[in-house]
Amino acid sequence: MSIDNKLFVTEEDEEDRTQDRADVEDESNDIDMIADENGTNSAIANEQEEKSEEVKAEDDTGEEEEDDPVIEEFPLKISGEEESLHVFQYANRPRLVGRKPAEHPFISAARYKPKSHLWEIDIPLDEQAFYNKDKAESEWNGVNVQTLKGVGVENNGQYAAFVKDMQVYLVPIERVAQLKPFFKYIDDANVTRKQEDARRNPNPSSQRAQVVTMSVKSVNDPSQNRLTGSLLAHKVADEEANIELTWAEGTFEQFKDTIVKEAEDKTLVALEKQEDYIDNLV
């Protein structure tokens, strides 16, 4: 019979039972301590792993910065406020000069209407390809140029830039014009043809006297302002005379020297504080 089933026990048996209970408690305490140590070790391991990931991320950022470092900084200058810089956009495909596309087509004449901001430039036609000289002389008044036409649109905040002597110079762009083919010679030929037909075949009915009723319009008559928007712009452009301009090549270096000289006499002053500028960005 075991000691636990005995009704009466001796002092020796009681001492043995007490010793067994103490041994069991010591074993449970040892198990708890081992569990605590394992938990502490896992927490330390997680913390070390997070630190290693942060260090790795910092290393990756440093590697990216090293891959794309700032090589050099350039002073920035804005000049050319007194210049009138226009940008032309050509809708046609540029010609190839050798294997590279030309910067712009060869221009034989240029015209400008300052009030309407209307540009017209003439480009000589290539008579060696896709050109019917006989038909051009017989039907189109011997046209040998292609006219490009476009209206300059105002653009604020756009600049053209160039680098000289390790400094960047910005020049404000006044207007941008997209130039497209304009077949004026067809309109001129149609007008000439109608005038010749009118001279050859005069209409007697048009020579008859007609009664015309005339009335005086009031100053406040709204019908006087019927031409608005694009219609008014076309009317103004048609009535405005062209200013004939001379197209000059090889003047870019002279233009740059003028801008550099003008920038030397000016100092840029900020219009607002740095804090206000950052607040506007945010």
Curated annotation (Swiss-Prot):
Gene Ontology BP terms: termination of RNA polymerase III transcription; transcription by RNA polymerase III; transcription initiation at RNA polymerase III promoter; tRNA transcription by RNA polymerase III
Compositional bias segments (type: Acidic residues): 10-35, 60-70
Protein origin, superkingdom: Eukaryota
Keywords of the record: DNA-directed RNA polymerase, Nucleus, Phosphoprotein, Transcription
Keyword Nucleus: yes
List of residues that carry Phosphothreonine: 61
GO cellular component: nucleus; RNA polymerase III complex
Segments for region (Disordered): 1-70
Subcellular location: Nucleus
Transmembrane parts of this sequence: none
Main location: nucleus
Coiled coil: none
Functional summary from the UniProt entry: DNA-dependent RNA polymerase catalyzes the transcription of DNA into RNA using the four ribonucleoside triphosphates as substrates. Specific peripheric component of RNA polymerase III which synthesizes small RNAs, such as 5S rRNA and tRNAs. The RPC53/RPC4-RPC37/RPC5 subcomplex is required for terminator recognition and reinitiation.
PANTHER family xrefs: DNA-DIRECTED RNA POLYMERASE III SUBUNIT RPC5, DNA-DIRECTED RNA POLYMERASES III 80 KDA POLYPEPTIDE RNA POLYMERASE III SUBUNIT 5
Subunit-structure text: Component of the RNA polymerase III (Pol III) complex consisting of 17 subunits. Interacts with RPC53/RPC4. RPC53/RPC4, RPC37/RPC5 and RPC11/RPC10 probably form a Pol III subcomplex.
Comment field (misc): Present with 1590 molecules/cell in log phase SD medium.
Name of the protein in question: DNA-directed RNA polymerase III subunit RPC5
Organism: Saccharomyces cerevisiae (strain ATCC 204508 / S288c)
